[in-house]
């Protein structure tokens, strides 16, 4: 379909013998869905506007350039287990969900995106050893659960430039991670849910000052299991706090809890 330049919606699936999808003239599209497990060449280089959600599933592509596409607040879902490099523009105007199936990648890179105007979610990159995200600001929610199984990759999960999360932060199961680091993060405007289950080191939010906003009702839940969640500069929590600690087992005891500079919790503490 080399002459197609616009489509109200486009769905490609159950095409078992197709290895190439070429849409070199497509500049705008509504809902866009591709599910094709033999496609190793995918060309949407002219696409400028996505006016609906886009889902790419089971493609064999290894790189994807999104730097020219305006997602107009819509959601891009990527379920491609060989996709190891994504390049975006400075501002990503939409939601980005990275949800590969049966992924065995050991390396993954996301480049170029500094400002995420929607949600960012990433799950089930079991074997990736370094997961370093470039964001400075994320306007929506962040959800990270790279390892929900028993794979021992010793992953390093870092957001070295991130300063503010406009929504909620959820750090779920990142089992056997060596490091989870948000060194510049100052504010989480939504709720915060963090678990340290089976981590190899503490999680430290070294510059985090506040969780929630005065206008909202948020919840901070810290599930501390064998390793700590350190917030040395945290002063204000606009909402309730629920701290859960692991019981003593196999010679280990529940951890110490210390948030020395907290001045205000507007909700319940439990």
Please place each PLM-identified region on the residue numbering.
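Concave beta-strand-loop units of leucine-rich repeat
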Residues: 3-18, 25-40, 46-62, 68-84, ...
């Amino acid at each position: 379909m080399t002459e197609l330049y616009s489509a109200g919606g486009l769905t490609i699936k159950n095409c078992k013998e197709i290895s190439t999808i070429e849409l070199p003239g497509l500049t705008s599209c509504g809902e866009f869905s591709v599910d094709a497990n033999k496609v190793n060449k995918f060309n949407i280089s002219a696409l400028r506007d996505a006016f609906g959600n886009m889902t790419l599933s089971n493609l064999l592509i290894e790189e994807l350039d999104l730097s020219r596409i305006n997602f107009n607040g819509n959601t891009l879902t990527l379920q491609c287990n060989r996709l190891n490099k994504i390049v975006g523009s400075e501002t990503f105007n939409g939601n980005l969900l990275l949800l590969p199936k049966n992924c065995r990648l050991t390396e993954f890179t996301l480049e170029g995106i500094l400002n995420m105007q929607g949600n960012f979610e990433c799950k089930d990159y079991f074997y990736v050893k370094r997961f370093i995200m470039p964001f400075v600001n994320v306007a929506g929610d962040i959800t990270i659960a790279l390892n929900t199984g028993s794979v021992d990759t010793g992953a390093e999960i870092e957001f070295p430039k991130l300063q503010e999360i406009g929504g909620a932060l959820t750090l779920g199961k990142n089992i056997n991670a060596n490091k989870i680091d948000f060194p510049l993060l100052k504010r989480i405007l939504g709720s915060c849910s963090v678990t340290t289950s089976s981590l190899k080191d503490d999680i430290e939010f070294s510059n985090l000052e506040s969780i929630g906003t005065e206008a909202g009702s948020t919840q901070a839940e810290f599930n501390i299991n064998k390793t700590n969640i350190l917030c040395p500069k945290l002063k204000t929590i606009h909402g309730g706090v629920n701290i859960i600690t692991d019981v003593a087992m196999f010679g280990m005891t529940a951890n110490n809890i210390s948030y020395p500079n907290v001045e205000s919790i507007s909700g319940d503490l439990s």
